[in-house]
Structures are given as structure tokens and as C-alpha cells.
Amino acid sequence: MEAGEEPLLLAELKPGRPHQFDWKSSCETWSVAFSPDGSWFAWSQGHCIVKLIPWPLEEQFIPKGFEAKSRSSKNETKGRGSPKEKTLDCGQIVWGLAFSPWPSPPSRKLWARHHPQVPDVSCLVLATGLNDGQIKIWEVQTGLLLLNLSGHQDVVRDLSFTPSGSLILVSASRDKTLRIWDLNKHGKQIQVLSGHLQWVYCCSISPDCSMLCSAAGEKSVFLWSMRSYTLIRKLEGHQSSVVSCDFSPDSALLVTASYDTNVIMWDPYTGERLRSLHHTQVDPAMDDSDVHISSLRSVCFSPEGLYLATVADDRLLRIWALELKTPIAFAPMTNGLCCTFFPHGGVIATGTRDGHVQFWTAPRVLSSLKHLCRKALRSFLTTYQVLALPIPKKMKEFLTYRTF
């Protein structure tokens, strides 16, 4: 998909359950996730089941004519030893999913010491957040249950691993807390973060591992230090529950999505509100009096940091370019709940209320040299450090995303 083209549906996966279970309570796909290296896809398909699917998809899932676009050269090397699809029975409704990065060498040694039954080559894990407050940790290659983390008193709504490979996990719950877990120490709970007054819907760790964002039902967005586990600041601006959040790949931007129909783009270092993306009605057949038609469900950054994808209750997947205030593309979808980009770009996965997963084409563009330089600099410079540089004002505005 080139920039400006409409997303095309590549494939749709439907749960293999009896039809009488469709549209029943607990059939929703609340979360979908790709592993950081793009080799696995996880799908909470409802009724306590998570599917682990090797990526790219096998041929039977891909419509004719799309093979070349959705399959990679990795597929040509698949043989008898290739990974197989796994079915995880979690025993409870699954709300949150998160893959760990491949653990760093020190974490691998600790993991091997505490889990000698798990070979070092099988260190990719999946965390599942459950309806009863439990978190289950699964070994991806084998589908074995490794750990069961207890502590939350209500639904675990979202999960996020530190991108560094340290196997630190953050969980967000309806019990109004976030909890920090160290999987290197048998899943020991190392911190409880309190302060939200209502359900915590989502959490996200910045790619540089310095900040944690959490958002809740009281319109609030909290930013925490991942070093001291203390509150840095609160971000005010939404008029309803904030249900989704994501950092840009260089950690320089934060986006939050709310039931108030807006996505807000923030500078997480200063707390400044940079821009709002309003989800206006585009279907004239829809009733203006329905205040919930554009309530947002999910927002995520593209891997190169130039685009956003959003899912809303008005039956649309939208794709936005950061420099524009209106979407560059739409795709019709029904009952969307979540979305995520493939880590290497080109594909967006969406989950729906009826338990389905859809894969869409996403923009593929060659990033400009200017953007690549900005992304590289902002990966290790805070906004305050950029503003302190002896460079022209226009360059500072570009590097801090005030201009594009």
C-alpha cells in the first residue's frame, strides 16, 4: 500500500467454534499482538482461548492475489521444523496480551537458572491478562505455561514488557492499580503503582524504557518513571475515559485515545499537547444523535513513526499521517476493538467484537533523511536537551515535532 491508498483486506481469521457461540458474551477479541521480531501473532479469540500463529500466515489464510504482498522470503525457507500454531486455554476471558522481546544475555542466564526445563533458545514468552486478575506467562515455541502471577483483584486489562529485554512486565487493571513484575525472579511483584481513581484501561512503556504511560476512566493520563516508579506528571485534556495509549518509536511522542472521539498527541517530556485528531462522522447514514458512534477503541504508531492507526465505534479503521489533522485513508470494519502494526510495517491487524481478526495493507513509504535523523537523535535526546542545543529555532521545532 502506497501513502494515500485505501487499506485492502489481506486476510480474515475466524475462531473455529460452533456458530451458537457467535455474538455471545466473552467472544470478543480484546487484544492482538505481534512478537517484536515479527515471527508470531497472538490473537485472543474469545471464550478463554488465545491462538499463537507463526507469521507470515500460511497460504490457506491468504486470498489469491495477495500472496506476494503479505508473505516474506522467510516463508520460502519453511520446512518440517517450522513453528506450528498453538492453542492456549487460559481458563478465563483474556483481555490483555503482550510478547516479551528476546531477552538480553543477562536475562537469558537468569531465566535458565530459574527455569532449567526451558531451553535457552525458547526464551520468547507471551503474557495474558485474565478476567479474574491473574496473569499467565506462556513459552511461545512450546505453548507451555511457565508462570502464574497473582496480585490484581480485578480484570487485567493491558500488559506491556520493557523493550530492553530485561523481562520486566507492567500490568494495568480494573482494580485501579498498575503492577510491576520481574520474570527473572519467578515473576516477583516488585512495585504497585496507585493513584488512578477508576479502572486503568491501558499501559505503554516508552521504547527507551524511561517512561510508563497509564490511562484510566477518570479522563486522566499518568506518566511514571520506569527508573524510580514514581509519578512524573498528569496529562489533562480528554473529556471522557482514556482507553488506549502508545509511544512513538523514538519515545518523543505519546498518543492517547478516548471515548471523547479524540486522539491527543503529547510531548511526554514537557506534557505539552501538540495536536488533536478528531474522529468526525463520515457516513451520512449514521445517526448524529448517537453520541457513541465515534468513541475510540484503539490507537497505535507505525514502526517508522510516521503514521497512526485508530479504531472507533463508527465502523472505520483510520490511518493518519502525523503532519495532517485528517485521515489519509479509511477502511470499513464492523465492531472493531483493537489494532496493531506489524513490526516491520506494511500490515495492520485489527480485532473485533465477534472474535475475528483482520489483516489490512498499511502505508509503506521510504522515510526522508530528515525524519531518519530526527528519529535517531530523539531516541537518546529529551525535549529539554534538544531545546538546549545551539541550533536554529526552526531546527528545534522540527526535532521536537512542533513542525514537520
From Swiss-Prot:
Task: Report what the protein is called.
Answer: WD repeat and SOCS box-containing protein 2
What is the organism lineage in this UniProt record? Eukaryota, Metazoa, Chordata, Craniata, Vertebrata
From what organism does this protein derive?
Homo sapiens
Residues of the region (Disordered) are 68-87
PANTHER family, alphabetically? WD REPEAT AND SOCS BOX-CONTAINING PROTEIN 2 (PTHR15622:SF1), WD40 REPEAT PROTEIN (PTHR15622)
Which GO CC annotations does the UniProt entry carry? cytosol
Record function comment: May be a substrate-recognition component of a SCF-like ECS (Elongin-Cullin-SOCS-box protein) E3 ubiquitin ligase complex which mediates the ubiquitination and subsequent proteasomal degradation of target proteins.
Q: Which CDD domains match?
A: SOCS_WSB_SWIP (cd03733), WD40 (cd00200)
Q: Where are the WD repeats?
A: 16-55, 81-140, 144-183, 188-226, 230-268, 283-322, 325-362
